[in-house]
Amino acid sequence: MGAVTDDEVIRKRLLIDGDGAGDDRRINLLVKSFIKWCNSGSQEEGYSQYQRMLSTLSQCEFSMGKTLLVYDMNLREMENYEKIYKEIECSIAGAHEKIAECKKQILQAKRIRKNRQEYDALAKVIQHHPDRHETLKELEALGKELEHLSHIKESVEDKLELRRKQFHVLLSTIHELQQTLENDEKLSEVEEAQEASMETDPKP
């Protein structure tokens, strides 16, 4: 499991008690305190209501600051997702280019295999004339060329296998990122549904 970022820790702490669920109650309490302060019959009662108003205002300011902070973190998170999406698009484009290159290498390997078969057939024909000096020289040259082509074929096959493995890793990474994005979207929908439900519930 990866290290938890500071933004994730702050976000969890800010959301642990809901998201603005008590704002309406605080505002109602502030209005009631203001009315009582206006109608206070003594200095002590007025001072008490004044302190309550200050406390309620402080809570409202804190709630507003918390909401703004969560909103700012959500914006940064969306920017990060957009960046990841662009990186995925670039990776996919690069993968298509690698696939095209691998196809070219496969065609080259097929040509090498065909040439090798032709050289093998020619070598068998040459073997019927072992006494001719020039024929032996040609056979030796063909053997060297065949060995060289075999090395090329092995190199191409190794590169092709490496590209296949790299492409498999890339596809796995893309799939994991897509799953992460889908899970985040589902979580966001659940949170929005909960917020909507809390807003529609009657206040005690």
Curated annotation (Swiss-Prot):
Disulfide bonds: none annotated. GO terms for molecular function: RNA binding. Residues 182-204 are annotated as: Disordered. The modification Phosphothreonine is found at T5. It is found in: Cytoplasm; Nucleus; Nucleus speckle. Residues 50-137 are annotated as: Interaction with THOC5. Keywords: Acetylation, Coiled coil, Cytoplasm, mRNA processing, mRNA splicing, mRNA transport, Nucleus, Phosphoprotein, RNA-binding, Transport. GO terms for cellular component: cytoplasm; cytosol; nuclear speck; nucleoplasm; nucleus; THO complex; THO complex part of transcription export complex; transcription export complex. The keyword Transmembrane does not apply. Residues 146-204 form a coiled coil. The modification N-acetylglycine is found at G2. One of its GO terms (biological process) is mRNA processing. Residues 105-204 are annotated as: Interaction with NIF3L1. The keyword RNA-binding applies. The modification N6-acetyllysine is found at K36. Belongs to the THOC7 family. Component of the THO subcomplex of the TREX complex which is thought to couple mRNA transcription, processing and nuclear export, and which specifically associates with spliced mRNA and not with unspliced pre-mRNA. Required for efficient export of polyadenylated RNA. Plays a key structural role in the oligomerization of the THO-DDX39B complex. Tetramer; as part of a THO-DDX39B complex. Component of the THO subcomplex, which is composed of THOC1, THOC2, THOC3, THOC5, THOC6 and THOC7. Component of the transcription/export (TREX) complex at least composed of ALYREF/THOC4, DDX39B, SARNP/CIP29, CHTOP and the THO subcomplex; in the complex interacts with THOC1, THOC2 and THOC5; forms a coiled-coil dimer with THOC5; together with THOC5 and THOC6, plays a key structural role in the oligomerization of the THO-DDX39B complex. TREX seems to have a dynamic structure involving ATP-dependent remodeling. Interacts with NIF3L1. This is THO complex subunit 7. It comes from Homo sapiens. The lineage of its organism: Eukaryota, Metazoa, Chordata, Craniata, Vertebrata.
